[in-house]
UniProtKB/Swiss-Prot annotation:
<dbReference type="GO" id="GO:0039657">
    <property type="term" value="P:symbiont-mediated suppression of host gene expression"/>
</dbReference>
<feature type="region of interest" description="Promoter-binding site">
    <location>
        <begin position="249"/>
        <end position="256"/>
    </location>
</feature>
<protein>
    <recommendedName>
        <fullName>RNA-directed RNA polymerase catalytic subunit</fullName>
        <ecNumber>2.7.7.48</ecNumber>
    </recommendedName>
</protein>
<keyword id="KW-0808">Transferase</keyword>
<dbReference type="GO" id="GO:0030430">
    <property type="term" value="C:host cell cytoplasm"/>
</dbReference>
<comment type="subunit">
    <text>Influenza RNA polymerase is composed of three subunits: PB1, PB2 and PA. Interacts (via N-terminus) with PA (via C-terminus). Interacts (via C-terminus) with PB2 (via N-terminus); this interaction is essential for transcription initiation. Interacts (via C-terminus) with human PKP2 (via N-terminus); the interaction competitively inhibits the interaction between the RNA polymerase subunits PB1 and PB2.</text>
</comment>
<keyword id="KW-0548">Nucleotidyltransferase</keyword>
<keyword id="KW-0597">Phosphoprotein</keyword>
<dbReference type="GO" id="GO:0019083">
    <property type="term" value="P:viral transcription"/>
</dbReference>
<dbReference type="InterPro" id="IPR007099">
    <property type="entry name" value="RNA-dir_pol_NSvirus"/>
</dbReference>
<comment type="function">
    <text>RNA-dependent RNA polymerase which is responsible for replication and transcription of virus RNA segments. The transcription of viral mRNAs occurs by a unique mechanism called cap-snatching. 5' methylated caps of cellular mRNAs are cleaved after 10-13 nucleotides by PA. In turn, these short capped RNAs are used as primers by PB1 for transcription of viral mRNAs. During virus replication, PB1 initiates RNA synthesis and copy vRNA into complementary RNA (cRNA) which in turn serves as a template for the production of more vRNAs.</text>
</comment>
<dbReference type="GO" id="GO:0042025">
    <property type="term" value="C:host cell nucleus"/>
</dbReference>
<keyword id="KW-0945">Host-virus interaction</keyword>
<feature type="region of interest" description="Disordered">
    <location>
        <begin position="53"/>
        <end position="82"/>
    </location>
</feature>
<dbReference type="GO" id="GO:0039694">
    <property type="term" value="P:viral RNA genome replication"/>
</dbReference>
<feature type="short sequence motif" description="Nuclear localization signal">
    <location>
        <begin position="203"/>
        <end position="216"/>
    </location>
</feature>
<dbReference type="GO" id="GO:0006351">
    <property type="term" value="P:DNA-templated transcription"/>
</dbReference>
């Protein structure tokens, strides 16, 4: 789809065409190679912003650490991370004064969450640094490995299944003199193939035990692995993002829970809400400033940009904030919340894979792993890389760089928002004690500032005061990138405000089209996206109709399912034509079986199977919705499925779509090539977890089951459930006596086997 006809029909005035300037059509840029360079940039920049702080050495790991807190006040406009503790605490106190009880209430809410959260909360999320294997893994696997290692080292509090107990193990693990872990490795040997008589490389996977002393373990526990952020639009340079290990994640989760609870109560916070709710919140703040500035005052709005928000934040400052917010709370709760910032003050950044060298003349390629950067001869590197390595060398320990100041991207979005809002809160007249006052919006590092004053001098004074207040808290408003307008026109988190929010339609462009999950899901997602944009993004009826036609065309080309009466020849057309001729009611065929499209903008909310059900031939219905069809590996489908949409801006969104299980809801099989690598051991573990979980869910089909509380194991829970179900089925005559006896016998056998084990 190279045309973008949507823009012709949007019911928009000219200023809304802002969306056409966004870099959102076409594929986003991806990074290739290693992120080592970007990570070194981050580490070096962060230290540069705090360079006038105090150096200390961590007694446990020997890592050099820079502490900029309460450092010299800035004399110029350069970004700096010298936040002043007393200023931060005062800002918190004023925030509490204007929102009585806010911290108290949020602490109470959070305490409940802390006591109820299960450890499987940590399985959510994508790639996670797995400290046992020293590389990234899916979150569930990384958690399983961590728990396995903990148990084999005598840490068993986690067996209760509560997250807080797992965190007790984490704390204890840090006091241990050594930790024993299992690592995977592979052996290669050359053997002759019996059939082809050629030499082949045979790989076997081995597991071996390895002991980590206290120092090595601590370094791993405090390590954040780094990667390059992919698919970032509108930027020339890539940047590094971090993924923390399992030791840090649980603590961060609780801190963010508290901060989220506070943000929900702050009218200036753009988190944790999104979409239309966020727009309503923003519109309220703007309305308040406009109504109060009608006659005597003028009002201006800054579309703000902060320089390197994360790299100037400081975990020590977050510790001060948490200490203040939880000051009347029980000791255990304060301790749990203070661990995350303490760990971040001692964090280590893993430098990634290292550098790739190739010699054109000798056709050689070699990888220099990050561990070698500490003592390799720098003559092989170009100037810029050489400077980076020289700068970072004093900070290196075992291929990781000590990074005490700064926060990595996305770790404490909610908490840093609270910090930002505390400055916006200081703009009330009772605090500025002068003729100007301000208010605004904050969402992580993005902000909009609305300043009111009797005249232009007042506006200027207000902005200056805001700028200087920010500096005291380690926030650096960029004078180059922020711009000011009469209130009524600004941008905040890619929402454009012009006397009301303008639909920034181009943001949604990437989600139009065929997702590539399977025929059933893709059809459903495609029409849902169009429906959602009619509701939320000013997609007009004419355009929606056109988008729908383009989508159906795109869909047919993707799955080669052109209508049965078409002339287009594809690999599938022979089968589709045969089906077309055999079918009495051709309107009943799904589009993916060569049927006509019955969707229009009025019925987008109805799944295609339901839309056509009454029109289908009976035998077609039978084939389409037959769970015993041997050609389809079925996934149990809830009535609502979630697709992960990648919007142009911000994190991946979950989008719900209606799912009707048919023979088109197939799941592709896993690629085989992974089976020959050292990942294989991990893959087998993962499949085992998968099987256990699937089995468990068969016994407890409702997705809302209460987890078995207490000490009963999964097996015991399933056996007792099987017995109850069997008895009910037998008594209601659904199963015969023989079947009932057999089920009971199997249950007893399972219990017997468990006892013997």
């Amino acid at each position: 789809m190279d045309v973008n006809p949507t823009l012709l029909f949007l019911k928009v005035p000219a200023q809304n065409a802002i969306s056409t300037t966004f870099p959102y059509t076409g594929d986003p840029p991806y990074s290739h190679g290693t992120g080592t360079g970007y990570t070194m940039d981050t580490v070096n920049r962060t230290h540069q912003y705090s360079e006038r702080g105090r150096w200390t050495t961590n007694t446990e790991t020997g890592a050099p650490q820079l502490n900029p807190i309460d450092g010299p006040l800035p004399e110029d406009n350069e970004p700096s991370g010298y936040a002043q503790t007393d200023c931060v605490l005062e800002a918190m106190a004023f925030l509490e004064e204007s929102h009585p009880g806010i911290f108290e209430n949020s602490c109470i809410e959070t305490m409940e969450v802390v006591q109820q959260t299960r450890v499987d909360k940590l399985t959510q999320g994508r790639q996670t640094y797995d400290w046992t294997l020293n590389r990234n893994q899916p979150a569930a696997t990384a958690l399983a490995n961590t728990i396995e290692v903990f148990r084999s080292n005598g840490l068993t509090a986690n067996e209760s299944g509560r997250l807080i107990d797992f965190l007790k193990d984490v704390m204890e693990s840090m006091d241990k003199e050594e930790m024993e872990i299992t690592t995977h490795f592979q052996r290669k040997r050359r053997v002759r193939d019996n059939v082809t008589k050629k030499m082949v490389t045979q790989r076997t996977i081995g597991k071996r035990k390895q002991r980590l002393n206290k120092r090595s373990y601590l370094i791993r526990a405090l390590t954040l692995n780094t990667m390059t952020k992919d698919a970032e639009r509108g930027k020339l340079k890539r940047r590094a993002i971090a993924t923390p290990g399992m030791q840090i994640r649980g603590f961060v989760y609780f801190v963010e829970t508290l901060a989220r609870s506070i943000c929900e109560k702050l009218e200036q916070s753009g988190l944790p809400v999104g979409g239309n709710e966020k727009k309503a919140k923003l519109a309220n703040v703007v309305r308040k400033m406009m109504t109060n500035s009608q006659d005597t005052e003028i009002s201006f709005t800054i579309t703000g940009d902060n320089t390197k928000w994360n790299e100037n934040q400081n975990p020590r400052m977050f510790l001060a904030m948490i200490t203040y917010m939880t000051r009347n709370q029980p000791e255990w709760f304060r301790n749990v919340l203070s661990i995350a910032p303490i760990m971040f003050s001692n964090k280590m950044a893993r430098l990634g894979k290292g550098y790739m060298f190739e010699s054109k003349s000798m056709k050689l390629r070699t990888q220099i792993p990050a561990e070698m950067l500490a003592n390799i001869d720098l003559k092989y590197f170009n100037d810029s890389t050489r400077k980076k390595i020289e700068k970072i060398r004093p900070l290196l320990i075992d291929g990781t760089a000590s990074l005490s100041p700064g926060m990595m991207m996305g770790m404490f979005n909610m908490l840093s928002t609270v910090l930002g809002v505390s400055i916006l809160n200081l703009g009330q007249k009772r605090y500025t004690k002068t003729t100007y006052w301000w208010d605004g919006l904050q969402s992580s590092d993005d902000f909009a500032l609305i300043v009111n004053a009797p005249n232009h001098e007042g506006i200027q004074a207000g902005v200056d005061r805001f700028y200087r207040t920010c500096k005291l808290l380690g926030i650096n408003m960029s004078k180059k990138k922020s711009y000011i307008n009469r209130t009524g026109t600004f941008e905040f988190t890619s929402f454009f405000y012009r006397y009301g929010f303008v639909a920034n339609f181009s943001m949604e462009l990437p989600s139009f089209g065929v997702s590539g999950i399977n025929e059933s899901a893709d059809m459903s997602i495609g029409v849902t996206v169009i429906k959602n944009n009619m509701i939320n993004n000013d997609l007009g009826p004419a355009t929606a109709q056109m988008a729908l036609q383009l989508f159906i065309k795109d869909y047919r080309y993707t799955y080669r399912c052109h209508r049965g009466d078409t002339q287009i020849q594809t690999r599938r057309s022979f089968e589709i034509k045969k089906l077309w001729e055999q079918t009495r009611s051709k309107a009943g065929l799904l589009v993916s079986d060569g049927g006509p499209n019955l969707f229009n903008i009025r019925n987008l909310h109805i799944p295609e199977v339901c839309l056509k059900w009454e029109l289908m031939d009976e035998d077609y219905q039978g084939r389409l919705c037959n769970p015993l069809n041997p050609f389809v590996s079925h996934k149990e489908i809830e009535s609502v499925n979630n697709a992960v949409m990648m919007p142009a801006h911000g994190p991946a969104k979950n989008m719900e779509y209606d799912a009707v299980a048919t023979t088109h809801s197939w799941i592709p099989k896993r690629n085989r090539s992974i089976l020959n690598t050292s990942q294989r051991g991990i893959l087998e573990d993962e499949q085992m977890y998968q099987r256990c979980c699937n089995l468990f869910e068969k016994f407890f089909p409702s997705s809302s089951y209460r987890r078995p509380v207490g000490i009963s194991s999964m097996v015991e829970a399933m056996v007792s459930r099987a017995r109850i179900d069997a008895r009910i089925d037998f008594e209601s005559g659904r199963i015969k006596k023989e079947e009932f006896t057999e089920i009971m016998k199997i249950c007893s056998t399972i219990e017997e086997l468990r006892r013997q084990k």
